[in-house]
Amino acid sequence: MSTFMAKAEDVERKWYVIDAADKPLGRVASEAARLLRGKHKPIFTPHVDTGDHVIIINAEKVALTGKKLTQKLYYHHSRYPGGMTLINYGTLLKTRPERAVEKAIKGMLPKNRLGEQMYRKLNVYKGEAHPHQAQKPEAWTIRD
């Protein structure tokens, strides 16, 4: 008997919606990364994208513990001398809350082409509304 290896064409993809309101950022990000990788499925294969589509709503209401609103920094560099940009989480949450959640999730995905494929199945929205009602997404609850 040989080990089962999933093929990309055999994977049935579902859509899940996660409500991030008043949930810790790390919990939301780790659950979303788990769904995007497909680790919740019995057919999980590390070298095949077996994950599902994930929609995250209420990104602006995500919770942080401690002093992370002022102390957690995101770095970006333009590759020009003196081109480093620092932005703290509080500012990022006010201006682009969906980007803060996306960065947390992307850091938990593989750093290769397969990780990029998985990241493309992520949709983050700052409010309640999302344009994916036609896909009939299932609600995924985050443990507290």
Curated annotation (Swiss-Prot):
A GO BP entry? translation
InterPro entries according to UniProt: Ribosomal_uL13, Ribosomal_uL13_bac-type, Ribosomal_uL13_CS, Ribosomal_uL13_sf
GO CC terms on record? cytosolic large ribosomal subunit
Could you list this entry's UniProt keywords, alphabetically sorted: Ribonucleoprotein, Ribosomal protein
Q: Any keyword RNA-binding?
A: no
Checking CDD domains in the record gives: Ribosomal_L13
HAMAP family (UniProt xref): Ribosomal_uL13
What this protein is reported to do is described as: This protein is one of the early assembly proteins of the 50S ribosomal subunit, although it is not seen to bind rRNA by itself. It is important during the early stages of 50S assembly.
Belongs to which family?
Answer: Belongs to the universal ribosomal protein uL13 family.
- Record text on subunit structure and interactions: Part of the 50S ribosomal subunit.
Descriptive protein name: Large ribosomal subunit protein uL13
Q: Organism classification, top ranks?
A: Bacteria, Bacillati, Bacillota, Clostridia, Eubacteriales
